[in-house]
């Protein structure tokens, strides 16, 4: 399966979710590769650090490619069971070329007005991609949300996202938890940490498509 984490807004947790899903799949003994298509190289650096510090943990093969990466993705999909793509947070050649070959798009969004304003153009981009890739499933993932259950922004964002025909709302809501930052610094996934709430969030996200 080819799973793309991408969107039109930076700083929404795409690399965090891409690396965490990669670890989740590695724990299931899946043969995976992580494709870092973001020039900030967050996923690539995370993978390198993991190999250097924790050689006994399941390792995540990572390659870095930029530009039109459709052919690279198709080649990797023949050699690996799953390809996880981390694309930059903007309308880019990497994002568009990934969308025409991906099976699944997860687009993380903060429950903020500035993030939600980007959804209309993303919705149109998905529609264009589906003209060439009818199998593409697209999910909006509410990410970095307040862990305070009394905050109403999640309900408001969910209501707003109902207006977009090309995007389904993922069941998972990923909260703004320190453990995600700790896991990134330690080159781990949260399922290798001790926070059960974060583990459940990644499990819920993974079970959206597995």
What are these regions (language model features)?
Residues 117-135:
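Conserved C-terminal guanine-recognition region of P-loop GTPase G domains, centered on the G4
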Residues 94-113:
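Inter-motif core of Ras-like GTPase G domains
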Residues 157-188:
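Beta-strand-loop-alpha "switch" segments that mediate conformational coupling across diverse proteins
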Residues 110, 137-152, 172-183:
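G-domain G4 guanine-recognition motif of GTPases
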Residues 2, 6-8, 12, 23-93, ...:
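P-loop/Walker-type NTP enzyme "switch/lid" segment
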